[in-house]
Amino acid sequence: MRLCDFAQEYVIRVGGSPGYAEQLRVLTKRLPWHVSDLTVDKIDRYLTTALQSLAATTVNNHRRMLNTLRKAALREGLLRDECIRPIRRVKAIFPEVRAWSHEEIKHLISTAKTLTGNTAHCPLSVFMPAYIVFAYTSGLRLGDMLAIRWDQVRGHRLSLVLRKTGQQHVVVLTDQSLAAIATLPRRGSGRIFGDLVSRRQFINHFRALVRKAELPGSSKFLRRSSATYAELSGIDATGHLGHRTADMKKRYLDIVILSENRRAVPALT
């Protein structure tokens, strides 16, 4: 049985999210393996080779997914491997997290208001400021931002099922974020942002906006900023982002912004 087919069946069987299914699809596309190839030795050799061309964090994710598929294959009797030692470790040092400060986000919004051109159904000078404010407030991923609908907004709450995890999630909205989306036209299936722009168009427009504003980063920085300022104000970023485990939030918190309330040591006298 081909590994790609087994991975697809595994996702369906365990009810995996679309995001997880896509990660497995990309990985198994790289590996023209069969299920019988999921031995410790072969996985070790792949990881060692992959480290020569891929980031350690990426290879570490590959290790995790291959180990999951290996365990599933062993349970179902599709794999025989008498090796009892664990798969080799991959030391992944996560890079320093960078988010946008409030001043940088305000500058980005000001720049967005000067944009010319349109999405398919809305001026960029209207769409982009609304998106930035709502994405910062909610901390949602791009896929969720493009999927949310008007009927999911109930007062100052937005209820949705996160596409990556399949978990129900509630976002607490501010007057500012509600006022931002009130400027947008309503169309089609009722998606707040997704009916106004495609994913590819959004990425291209946002990349151009960031360049014009002369800022580092991408739309992912809004999620990081949301997590960082949530934590800074006493809101647990784990629940705010919809993570299942608390350990994940460290990949989103900008420790420089978190240090805003810290004082320096007394100067030498």
Predicted segment positions?
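Major-groove DNA-contacting interfaces characterized by cationic-aromatic clusters
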Residues: 36, 81, 121-126, 158-161, ...
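Catalytic-site neighborhood detector that most strongly recognizes the C-terminal catalytic loop/helix
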Residues: 1, 99, 162-166, 241-266
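Short, basic (Lys/Arg/His-rich) helix/loop patches that form interaction surfaces
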Residues: 114-124, 171, 183-191, 203-239, ...
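Conserved tyrosine-mediated DNA breakage-rejoining catalytic core shared by Y-recombinases
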Residues: 138, 143-183
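Basic, Lys/Arg- and aromatic-enriched nucleic-acid-binding interface segment
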Residues: 60, 79, 88-142, 146
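DNA breakage-rejoining catalytic core of tyrosine-based enzymes
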Residues: 36, 79-81, 92-113, 165-175, ...
